[in-house]
Amino acid sequence: MSDSAATDTKQSFQLKSASVSLTALELYYFDNDEFEANLRDKISQAPGFFKDIPLIISLEKYEGLDSELDFFRMIGTCRRHNIHVIGVRAANDDQRRLARGASLALLPGGSLKEKPAQEAPAQAEPEAAAAPEPANEPAPAKIINQPVRSGQQVYAPEGDLIILAPVQAGAEVLAAGNIHVYGPLRGRALAGIHGAESARVFCQSLEAELVSIAGHYKISEDLQDIGWKSAVQIQLRDDVLVVTPLDKA
């Protein structure tokens, strides 16, 4: 092939940044039989939600022995239920070696642990009051004027998401903060995706396939008891999603 021909040849791929919705499995200990039984129970609550999803194993709260971690069995169990384990989060050095052996991606922890406060020195001289720092401006809301159609995903990584149109079945909307839908919400809405438990979801007609706040979710069947096909707000109270009609909020 000539140099000019090689120059004109297009590359076979291009790397781009992407934002995707991932589900994390927060593992406390691992026993394969119990793991599969718990997994089967979760899937039975929302079979459509779990089908062919990518999954991250989070080890931030893992209390079992590292020697009990069998990622190969974990991957196989999940795969039998059409769930695809793609990586491990917040692993220590030994856990990282086990994860590498199972060809899993390694991700950092979701949040940093707090450091213990240091004791103040005895008889410390009072310091002059520092000038107050300017308050951080809240992240601007992302505003969508068009309907969000089936197969589309709209993501607000820092603030609220405001949609001035319907969200169709099969669509997905995600936000770090609140989600406002000025129309029917028929797809999936995930608010507080970085862990903000104060986030809320507002819509003019609740017909959603799934609503999630800070990882706590309800599927369509669970949402139909209160406020179905009416204007509601949804918030998290004591780790449970609570639906309140807007005329009673």
UniProtKB/Swiss-Prot annotation:
Q: Pfam families, alphabetically?
A: MinC_C (PF03775), MinC_N (PF05209)
**Keyword field contains Cell cycle:** yes
* UniProt subunit comment: Interacts with MinD and FtsZ.
The job of this chain, per UniProt, is described as: Cell division inhibitor that blocks the formation of polar Z ring septums. Rapidly oscillates between the poles of the cell to destabilize FtsZ filaments that have formed before they mature into polar Z rings. Prevents FtsZ polymerization.
Spell out the PANTHER family in the cross-references: SEPTUM SITE-DETERMINING PROTEIN MINC
Show the NCBIfam families listed in the entry.
Answer: minC
Protein family membership: Belongs to the MinC family.
Protein name as it appears in the record: Probable septum site-determining protein MinC
The organism named in the record is: Marinobacter nauticus (strain ATCC 700491 / DSM 11845 / VT8)
